[in-house]
């Protein structure tokens, strides 16, 4: 039973903020159902991008990210979210059940972390090297608290090998019609509440200066941040010790935590998952980190120009499409 009564409006507001979480091609593969002052998170299987994400692994990462974002939003509202993961063995889509207890105190850190949800962007442009990296790296390592997830940093002298892994992914998919059709659909020019708008994509010239990004359709002829030259970001790798669904969900939660920590430190980020979508390129990344773990997601972390406008926020689905209240059964 929940220890405190939280109104549906508070839960709904927290879910709306949480839905700023990143997901593959902004597919937002989640559903929330509130009932009796609790809320449940479900995977929306109709929003899994199977041509890209064959096993639904990345959908689980996205759901983990939205779950952590929700906990952050509730903490800023003065409430601790108590999460039970995979509570129903008969329903694999039921990822978490959450009840609530009052927090002792809402700190400035809680508020700033919730603010970081709105400030965070997926920035696909080149970055400058992040300052004070040793301190930042130490902080990011402490952020990854799940026993099933580890964090590593790609050494600078191994960046060519990482670029080769990225190139291998794209070459293996050169004739994959289903993959490219899915990619083009989710980067369409039409105004919508999902997918990646053209304003969030990069030109060919900009893409050439980030040697391990996903190859998206080229929609512009711009060359932003020419003063940065080639990307000098640091690259993090989040890995799991197995491929169990629980580990993937936790990895998504840790991805959220890393992104928010980096944002709070004033740094720009870009999540990369294409390099882990195929076994051949994923194995190359595993060799680079030299650990008995399976890479699930990479994150570029760096510095964007201080006076530059941040990339526009990508759209999100209306809250009433992802959040529902289950009526009480009075029988």
Swiss-Prot record:
GO cellular component, one term: plasma membrane
Keyword annotations of the record: Flavoprotein, FMN, NAD, NADP, Oxidoreductase
Keyword Heme carried by entry: no
UniProt xrefs under InterPro entries: Nitroreductase-like, Nitroreductase/BluB
EC number of the protein: 1.-.-.-
Superkingdom of the organism of origin: Bacteria
Family: Belongs to the nitroreductase family.
One GO MF term attached to the UniProt entry: oxidoreductase activity
EC class: oxidoreductase
Keyword Flavoprotein applies: yes
Positions with a binding annotation for FMN: 28-32, 316
Record-annotated membrane-spanning stretches: none
UniProt protein name: Putative NAD(P)H nitroreductase acg
Cofactor(s) this protein cannot do without: FMN
Native source organism of the sequence: Mycobacterium tuberculosis (strain ATCC 25618 / H37Rv)
Triggers of expression: A member of the dormancy regulon. Induced in response to reduced oxygen tension (hypoxia), low levels of nitric oxide (NO) and carbon monoxide (CO). It is hoped that this regulon will give insight into the latent, or dormant phase of infection. Induced in C57BL/6 mouse lungs 3 weeks after low dose aerosol infection with H37Rv bacteria.
NCBIfam families: Rv3131_FMN_oxido
């Amino acid at each position: 039973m929940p220890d405190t009564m939280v109104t549906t409006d508070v839960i709904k507001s927290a879910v709306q903020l949480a839905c700023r979480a990143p997901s593959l091609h902004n597919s937002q593969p989640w559903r929330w159902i509130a009932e009796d002052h609790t809320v449940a998170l479900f995977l929306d299987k109709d929003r899994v991008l199977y041509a890209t994400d064959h096993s639904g692994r990345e959908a689980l990462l996205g759901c983990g990210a939205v779950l952590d974002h929700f906990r952050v939003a509730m903490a800023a509202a003065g409430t601790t979210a108590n999460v039970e993961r995979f509570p129903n063995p008969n329903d694999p889509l039921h990822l978490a059940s959450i009840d609530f207890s009052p927090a002792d105190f809402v700190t400035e850190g809680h508020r700033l972390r919730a603010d970081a949800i709105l400030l965070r962007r997926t920035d696909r442009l080149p970055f400058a090297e992040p300052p004070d990296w040793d301190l930042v790296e130490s902080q990011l390592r402490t952020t990854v608290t799940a026993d099933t997830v580890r964090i590593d940093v790609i050494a600078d002298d191994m960046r060519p090998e990482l670029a080769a892994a990225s190139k291998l992914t794209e070459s293996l998919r050169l004739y994959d019609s289903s993959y490219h059709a899915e990619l083009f659909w989710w980067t369409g020019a039409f105004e919508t509440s999902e997918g990646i708008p053209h304003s969030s994509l990069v030109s060919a010239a900009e893409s050439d200066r980030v040697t391990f990004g996903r190859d998206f359709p080229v929609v512009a002829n711009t060359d932003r941040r020419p003063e940065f030259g080639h990307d000098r970001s640091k690259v993090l790798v989040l890995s799991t010790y197995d491929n169990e669904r629980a580990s993937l969900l936790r990895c998504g939660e840790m991805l959220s935590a890393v992104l928010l920590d980096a944002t709070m430190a004033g740094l720009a980020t870009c999540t990369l998952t294409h390099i882990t979508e195929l076994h051949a390129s994923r194995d190359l990344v595993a060799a680079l980190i030299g650990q008995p773990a399976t890479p699930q997601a990479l994150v570029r972390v760096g510095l964007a120009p201080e006076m530059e406008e941040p990339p526009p926020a990508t759209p999100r689905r209306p809250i009433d499409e992802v959040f529902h209240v289950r009526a009480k059964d009075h029988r």
